[in-house]
């Protein structure tokens, strides 16, 4: 048994911490990993609830196995070197004391539920080589305030960031192709989001319950799943897609939020203009207020009827412009 084991220093020639080595050793509070270690096995430190210090100064660690630090509820930080590639499923599940999730640039894969319920973490850094973010990988990380998904990521898993209720800023880089079901649901503080042109699929209920969400920018040929924005009471969707595009599920906009079809965007992705036609405005009425579009470093000042002109219409007076009018977004630098 390991009931009285408190400090662990491993042999310096060790290259692997084998699966289940310190499983359930609840009294361990300090571990020093040798510099030659390349992998930490499945459940190696599972349930080490007193573990508060992991010392590692090496540069060879490439993989952290499934459940490796599962429920290590007293671990405030962990340095994993700069060679780490794979983080297994549930690897840091419920590490509620973890203050920052600062992943080395070498990381490529983040397994399902890897940092699920790390409710103490206030910052997250994803490096430029992450290709896949697993299902629920960062779900219920309730102290995160911003999330930036790099261009290397191809897919964001189901529920990946669900319940990250403090996130106000979400950046999704060009390159991301798929966003899973409920991936960003219940992000109650999120105020706006611009989806990249590279995105081919937005999953069911991906932004469901984002109750503070205003402007949503959808560019390119994105297939949108059922209830994608359900319950997003202040959302307005700005898209360059046509009204009759066939790649949206029937109930993609099941909360009947305002949609502006056929928008023209700049290369940087901000709104330039919009033409009022019989089908370009959907669900714009007195009880369905239009949220202003968003541009970094600027505030939206209204709609002009000539390019570079002064604002003639307020954001929610779109419906008053005659059919055939092209409206130009007026931006004021902050």
Name what the model sees in each region.
Residues 32, 78-79, 265-334:
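Secondary-structure capping and domain/repeat boundary segments
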Residues 1-8, 23, 46, 93, ...:
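Short intrinsically disordered, low-complexity coil segments enriched in acidic
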Residues 18-23, 41-46, 65-70, 88-93, ...:
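Consensus positions within tandem repeat domains that build extended binding/scaffold surfaces
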Residues 234-271, 302-304, 332:
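Extracellular/surface-exposed low-complexity segments
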Residues 2-16, 26-39, 49-63, 73-86, ...:
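Structural signature of tandem-repeat unit edges
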């Amino acid at each position: 048994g390991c009931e009285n084991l408190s400090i662990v220093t491993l042999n310096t020639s060790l290259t692997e911490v084998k699966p289940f080595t310190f499983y359930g050793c609840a009294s361990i509070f300090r571990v020093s990993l040798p510099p030659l270690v390349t992998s930490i096995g499945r459940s190696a430190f599972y349930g080490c609830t007193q573990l508060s210090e992991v010392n590692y100064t090496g540069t060879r660690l490439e993989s952290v196995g499934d459940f490796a630090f599962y429920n290590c509820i007293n671990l405030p930080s962990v340095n994993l070197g700069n060679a780490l590639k794979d983080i297994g499923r549930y690897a840091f599940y419920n590490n509620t004391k973890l203050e920052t999730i600062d992943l080395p640039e070498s990381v490529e894969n983040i397994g399902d539920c890897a940092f699920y319920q790390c409710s103490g973490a206030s910052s997250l850094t994803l490096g430029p080589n992450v290709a896949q973010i697993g299902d629920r990988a960062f779900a219920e990380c309730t102290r995160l305030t911003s999330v930036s998904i790099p261009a290397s990521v191809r897919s964001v898993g189901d529920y990946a960031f669900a319940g990250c209720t403090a996130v106000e800023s979400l950046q999704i880089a060009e390159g991301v192709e798929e966003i899973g079901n409920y991936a960003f649901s219940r992000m109650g503080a999120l105020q706006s989001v611009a989806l990249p042109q590279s995105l081919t699929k937005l999953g069911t209920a991906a932004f469901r319950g984002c109750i503070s969400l205003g402007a949503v920018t959808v560019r390119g040929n994105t297939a949108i799943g059922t209830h994608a924005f359900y319950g997003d009471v202040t959302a307005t969707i700005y898209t360059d897609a046509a009204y009759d595009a066939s790649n949206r599920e029937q109930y993609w906009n099941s909360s009947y939020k305002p949609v502006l079809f056929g928008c023209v965007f700049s290369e940087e992705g901000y709104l330039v203009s919009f033409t009022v036609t019989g089908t370009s405005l959907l669900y714009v009425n007195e009880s369905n207020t239009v949220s202003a579009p968003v541009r970094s470093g600027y505030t939206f000042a209204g709609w002009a009827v000539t390019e570079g002109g002064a604002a003639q219409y307020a954001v929610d007076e779109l419906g008053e412009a005659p059919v055939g009018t092209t409206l130009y977004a007026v931006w004021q630098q902050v």
